[in-house]
UniProtKB/Swiss-Prot annotation:
Residues binding Mg(2+) 1: 296, 300
Protein name: Terpene synthase 9
Provenance organism: Solanum habrochaites (Wild tomato)
Enzyme class, spelled out: lyase
EC id: 4.2.3.71, 4.2.3.-, 4.2.3.15, 4.2.3.113
Sequence motif DDXXD motif, residues: 296-300
Pfam families cross-referenced by the UniProt entry: Terpene_synth, Terpene_synth_C
Cofactor dependence: Mg(2+); Mn(2+)
Reactions the enzyme catalyzes: (2E,6E)-farnesyl diphosphate = (1E,4E)-germacrene B + diphosphate; (2E)-geranyl diphosphate = terpinolene + diphosphate; (2E)-geranyl diphosphate = limonene + diphosphate; (2E)-geranyl diphosphate = beta-myrcene + diphosphate
Length: 544
């Protein structure tokens, strides 16, 4: 018989207070016309430089790579697309490991399939990479980065990753500070390869690396710095507006049991899309994510089962009249939740895009049902579900099936009904992204959650069903994460079922999970590395 929730104390988590408070209220600087003019002038100079570089040349490959890593490629989308298409259509023979690896990575990043057989020229008859390559640090680094674009069953790229990782670790430990720029770049890559790095984080770190590279392009560097600072002003202004909204709700006081993480939510969504044209979408999505976080904590860290049953029903009804059926303390959050989606409807109905909100609501209902399912398991005498059952529910309850749909709502591009239907059917790339987020979250957080009476994690379920040790479960989950990344890479190969910009949102969302859950749950424990990342992206400007 189910345990009576009335006899259970609330499962309080005692999350630490907000790191930022209302700090960003004061960031109201507007981008000046002078700044816009200066950036536009540099942009046209860089565009000319890109167009005039010989097609397929080393010069053009290196320039495109620098643009992408410095965070300014969004200005030259069409030109880069054309250049990569030309490189793909007419590849040139080359025996330079750095150039072949760079060529391979750029082509695959753009969604074109290029065979990994291009690396066979660098291997012996036994399939092992030639030892002489260990003297080519730049080549090793490029091959290392290229290996993260691998898909399943690409043994040569598995070998490449193992080979380069081993030798780069050895090289960096013995490298003198005379090669400081390259040493920093190698160290950063070993910690966070390009494929898994959030675009703004990559831009911030690469500006410093690029500046210390003697071969850097002065105009491109200046442009990247100006653009970073100009975008930072826009992002600060957005966060100021969101902080005003959050302060007016007064939810930090009304829901003291929940994680007060508005700035962290914004950083998360900034990872999904940073470009100016997505300003509206970012603000909409940040509000949704912040309210989702409160709902998640209400389920996990405060409410009793008897309170959650009518709350779940109210979400499924999506009706202001349902507010009387839920606990008084839940009502402000429920009303604010409805208001966010009503605001979306008001804005999008004028553009004939009301159907987008319908799909977003459906995904949110599905997410809350998944939260409630976990509550039912916990209430049912601490029932431990089967691993497969828990996995299917966890892929939803992690939120990574809700966000890809909802983040499209405020975007300006044309997005077809078929794309939203495709997302609703849990495509492979979304399942892979969800698995990465859930597995990484469980690895770093499951022991803490069990201490406060949380539903059994996927790790506990796997250990119970398969008689595995904790370390065996960790190894299994890490392997699953690696394979999920390979699936994401494969889903980018053209022709794709949906526009590339939709897939890019899922990729960036996955990068956010990798960033936030790599060593610990940085969203919950936001005082450490996440605070430093936010500081570098949203507070500290780049010195010109």
């Amino acid at each position: 018989m189910a345990a009576s929730s009335a006899n259970k104390s609330r499962p309080l988590a005692n999350f630490h207070p907000t790191v930022w408070g209302y700090h960003f209220l004061s960031y109201t600087h507007e981008i000046t016309n002078q700044e816009k003019v200066e950036v536009d002038e540099y942009k046209e100079t860089i565009r000319k430089m890109l167009v005039e570089a010989p097609e397929g040349s080393e010069q053009k490959l290196v320039l495109i790579d620098a643009m992408q890593r410095l965070g300014v490629a969004y200005h030259f989308h069409n030109e880069i697309e054309t250049s990569i298409q030309n490189i793909f259509d007419a590849p040139k023979q080359n025996n330079n490991l750095h150039i072949v690896s760079l060529h391979f990575r750029l082509v695959r990043q753009q969604g074109h399939y290029m065979s990994s057989d291009v690396f066979k020229q660098f291997t012996n008859q036994d399939g092992k990479f030639k030892e002489r390559l260990t003297n080519d640090v730049q080549g090793l680094l490029s091959l290392y980065e290229a290996s993260y674009l691998r898909v399943r069953d690409e043994e040569i790229l598995e070998e490449a990753l193992a080979f380069t990782t081993t030798h780069l670790k050895s090289i960096v430990s013995n490298m003198s500070n005379n090669n400081n720029s390259l040493k920093v770049e190698v160290s950063e890559a070993l910690t966070q390869p390009i494929r898994m790095t959030l675009p703004r984080m990559e831009a911030r770190r690469y500006i410093s690396i690029y500046e210390n590279n003697d071969a850097h392009n002065h105009l491109l560097l200046k442009f990247a710095k100006l653009d970073f600072n100009m975008l930072q002003k826009l992002h600060q202004r957005e966060l100021s507006d969101l902080t005003r909204w959050w302060k007016d709700l007064d939810f930090a006081n009304k829901y003291p049991y929940a994680r007060d993480r508005l700035v962290e939510c914004y950083f998360w969504i900034l990872g999904v899309y940073f470009e100016p044209k997505y300003s509206r979408a970012r603000k909409m999505m940040t509000k949704v994510l912040k309210m989702t976080s409160i709902i998640d904590d209400t389920f996990d860290a405060y409410a009793t089962f008897d309170e959650l049953e009518p709350f779940n029903d109210a979400i499924q009804r999506w009706d202001a009249n349902a507010i009387d059926s839920i606990q008084p303390y839940m009502r402000p959050a429920y009303q604010a939740f409805l208001d966010i989606y009503s605001e979306m409807e008001q804005v999008l109905s004028k553009e004939g895009k009301l159907d987008r909100v319908y799909y977003a609501k459906n995904e949110m209902k599905k997410l809350v049902r998944a939260y409630f399912k976990e509550t039912q398991w916990l209430n049912d005498c601490d029932h431990i579900p089967k691993y497969e059952e828990h996995m299917e529910n966890s892929l939803v309850s992690g939120g990574y099936m809700m966000i890809p749909t909802t983040c499209l709502v405020g975007m300006e591009e044309f997005i077809s009904i078929e794309t939203f239907e495709w997302l609703m059917n849990d495509p492979l790339i979304v399942r892979a992204s969800s698995l990465i987020a859930r597995a990484m979250n469980d690895i770093v957080g499951h022991e803490v959650e069990q201490e406060r009476g949380h539903v059994a994690s996927l790790i506990e379920c796997y250990m119970k069903d398969y008689g595995a040790s904790k370390q065996e479960a960790y190894a299994k989950f890490k392997k699953d994460v690696t394979n999920a990344w390979k699936d994401i890479n494969k889903e980018f190969f053209r022709p794709t079922e949906v526009p590339m910009f939709v897939l890019e949102r899922v990729l960036n969302l996955t990068r956010a999970a990798d960033t936030l859950y790599k060593e610990k749950d940085a969203y919950t424990n936001a005082k450490g590395k996440l605070k430093n990342m936010i500081n570098s992206i949203l507070i500290e400007s780049v010195k010109i």
